[in-house]
Swiss-Prot record:
Signal peptide limits: 1-28
Organism domain of life: Bacteria
NCBIfam families assigned to the protein according to its UniProt record, in alphabetical order: TRAP_TAXI
NAD found in the keyword field: no
Organism the protein comes from: Brucella melitensis biotype 1 (strain ATCC 23456 / CCUG 17765 / NCTC 10094 / 16M)
Name by which UniProt lists this protein: 31 kDa immunogenic protein
Keywords: Signal
């Protein structure tokens, strides 16, 4: 009986030990899932998101241990912010102006409430304001858009709000132009056919559709500069100066303009240590190599501009890393 009791005690102990070991192993191996909302698969956000997701995932020795990051295609800035707010995404890419409006409840988010938990993880690269004009339209400045047929992009887009800000700085409203509200693709086709004089587009240069227009029809880019640009920069923290270099588009001269920024945002509810570790891996040498080799815009993602265009607060975890790295005081 004693021998049997001893066997039973050993068996119970062994089972308990196995359960404990299994539980500790499960805890050690439990993955943390971290989704990055991007944009359409044909755009820039999606491939950049894929590069970053691969870099920060903890599959090897170079990522965040236990982290499983994935790039998720989406409808872009507004959709990503709304999904972060609802908890459907842990993070996402957005234009800096859209992030600013969401956080402050203005612009596109006027009357929709503030997204007060929105936090910045990193500013990535500039997204340039293009005012694309027909070469024969004789549009030399924004003021020359008066009375012209101009597409401002669709209602609900970030571009249309940017366009209105630019027009206002030059003393114009939509009533002063023959405004149309087309996506960039249809706007380019209308311009090509002579049914449109100019259109606004926000994105990195060179972009394929505008390059094709420059080759097939000839275009000019309308500058945004001088006191009007300074007025915009003073009023809106999410804008910065930019220049489209000569040759970015066929036979188009260097053009001063403004830009917003592509930003990686998350929620204040994400753990500080997690965001700290993600930010740290984002800026290590291996991620640098992956970004440089993986996409043209990857080369523009730099640590020294990671905290620029601060229209919303940094996540505390990201802020801790940037202070350690000397980017923030």
């Amino acid at each position: 009986m004693k021998f049997g009791s001893k066997i039973r005690r050993l068996a119970v102990a062994a089972v308990a030990g196995a359960i404990a070991l299994g539980a500790s192993f499960a805890v050690a191996q439990a993955p943390t899932f971290f989704r990055i909302g991007t944009g359409g698969t044909a755009g820039t956000y999606y491939p950049i998101g894929g590069l970053i997701a691969n870099a920060i995932s903890g599959a090897g020795e170079k990522g965040v241990p236990g982290l499983v990051a994935t790039a998720v295609s989406s409808n872009g800035s507004v959709a990503n912010i709304n999904a972060i707010k609802s908890g459907a995404l842990e993070s996402g890419f957005t234009q800096s102006d859209v992030a600013y409006w969401a956080y402050n409840g203005t612009g596109l988010y006027d009357g929709k409430g503030k997204v007060e938990d929105l936090r910045l993880l990193a500013t990535l690269y500039p997204e340039t304001i293009h005012i694309v004009a027909r070469k024969d339209a004789n549009i030399k400045s924004v003021a020359d858009l008066k009375g012209k047929r101009v597409s401002l992009d669709e209602p609900g887009s970030g571009t249309i709000v940017d366009a209105r800000i630019v027009l206002e700085a030059y003393g114009l409203t939509e009533d002063d132009i023959k405004a149309e509200h087309l996506k960039p693709g249809p706007a380019g086709e209308r311009l090509k056919d002579g049914a449109l004089d100019a259109y606004f587009f926000v994105g990195g240069y060179p972009t394929g559709a505008i390059s094709e227009l420059a080759i097939s029809n000839g275009i000019s880019l309308v500058p945004i500069s001088g006191p009007e640009a300074d007025k915009i920069l003073e009023k809106y923290s999410f804008f910065s100066k930019d220049v489209v270099p000569a040759g970015a588009y066929k036979d188009v001269a260097e053009t001063p303009t403004l830009a917003v920024a592509a930003q990686w945002v998350t929620s204040a509810k994400q753990p500080d240590d997690l965001i700290y570790n993600i930010t740290k891996v984002l800026w290590n040498e291996d991620t640098r190599k992956a970004l440089d080799a993986g996409h043209a815009k990857g080369k523009l993602i730099k640590l020294d501009s990671a905290t620029s265009s601060l229209g919303i607060p940094l996540h505390p975890g990201a802020e801790r890393f940037y202070k350690e790295a000397g980017v923030l005081k």
